[in-house]
Amino acid sequence: MSNPNIDPNTDWVLVGDIGGTNARFALADIRPARPILYAEQSLPTSDYASLQHAAETYLAQHAFKPKRAAIAVAAAVTGDAVQLTNRAWSFSQIELQTALGLESLTILNDFGAVAYAVPALDDSEREYLYGPQRALQSPVTVLGPGTGLGMAILLQDSAQQWSVQETEGGHVSFAPLSEEEQLIARWLNARFGRTSNERLLCGAGLSHIDAALAGAEHPSLHAGSETLREPSKIVQLALDGHDISARRTLARFCAVLGSVAGDAALIHGARTLMIAGGIVPRFIPFLKSSGFRERFLSKGRFVAYLENVAVYVITHPNPGLLGASVCLRAESNAIT
């Protein structure tokens, strides 16, 4: 059934943001400076065998056949073959383009897409945390925990044009800075063989931190048992204030995030830091009162440098979709 709200005279494009948990889609009008998203929808990745299946389901629901698409994926995009990091989906870009009947298909990293969205955000779509309140300054570090830990760099050239450098910075090795973090690292090393920052700074990472700390505090109760609490439950209990262990877990999560964010800002030479992902926007007041700021600045001789980095949390509900449409608009303008 056709959708009466979709203007057939508009050159709608398909945009997607595919993570380990959700496959988000929308139709986008990329003619305006800030593209317009329509018919946004989130599908659980666990319900679909492949990205193609999920995309076909979405398009069938809206009786729409686009000519162009830009799809952001939680994966390293280095060639035709793409394998999602936290979901058993793999595909060929060429084959997906053919299967969906597209004239062109752009595949980009999910946090690369979030970075593309940053210059298009309104003030109401980002919340200020710390540092100078000024116009957006390059370089911009974009990072955030969701199903995984994404990271990208946004750069502005002398002609005031923005470009994005995709990275896999979330997979850098974790550097514990306290006895408690060393305990967590040992717990993770025993189970995964190597501990990256993503093992702590993602949804599952909250559960990992929680289990490691609980096991250390009550070893007899947790011997031989590793029932993990759901990340959403941990956050809820921490914010309610009645569960000391949940608050301890979330506080440690925020502290580690501060360390990783500070390291990334130094490596990228950042003047701005944007925190995104599906987790942090749920507890911004908690983050502000946590050890995040102290750990972000705790870089020895470079405290003053980091004090001059503006730090924000992105609150736009679907920055990956917006960014994918911005990316496709930039590509279209470059061609014309």
Short names for language-model regions:
Residues 27-28, 56, 82-84, 119-120, ...:
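Short amphipathic alpha-helical segments
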Residues 128-132, 136-198, 284, 291-297, ...:
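Glycine-rich phosphate-binding loop of actin/hexokinase-like ATP-binding domains
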